[in-house]
Amino acid sequence: MIVLDASAAVELLGDTQAGKKIAARLSTERVLHAPHLLDLEVASAFRSHSALGAVDAERIAQALALHRKLPIMRHPHYPYLDRIWALRHNFTAYDACYLALAEALGATLLTRDKALASARLQRGNVEVI
């Protein structure tokens, strides 16, 4: 079971070299999991790419269309607020949201964020790709 974070999703949707590795890693997964936060973080990342002129609007529209088609089961973050708060000393609330979900599901959090590799989950693990 995989929880996909925004850093991995943006690479996947952007069809980058890292995105190709992520696609290969996800090839056997029928359903991915993510907090509802994922959609906002993906949109925010693409907004930044657009503002920098790194990616044109048409390509971003294609990536967002693909994002909507990914088999992602979205989870509310409200049930995990206590755990998110408990992780506050080492992680932002945004990062802790993905960690708390992976922990609750006993899943692997797939990320590009090396800082998350230090997380010690009670159940599940973190895979930096």
Positions of PLM-derived features:
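Active-site neighborhoods of divalent-metal-dependent phosphate/nucleic-acid chemistry enzymes
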Residues: 70-112
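Histidine- and aromatic-rich ligand-binding microenvironments
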Residues: 4-5, 32-36, 90-93, 113, ...
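Phosphate- and divalent-cation-binding pockets in alpha/beta enzyme and binding domains
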Residues: 21, 41, 83, 118-119
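Active-site-proximal, substrate-binding regions of enzyme catalytic domains
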Residues: 43-72, 83
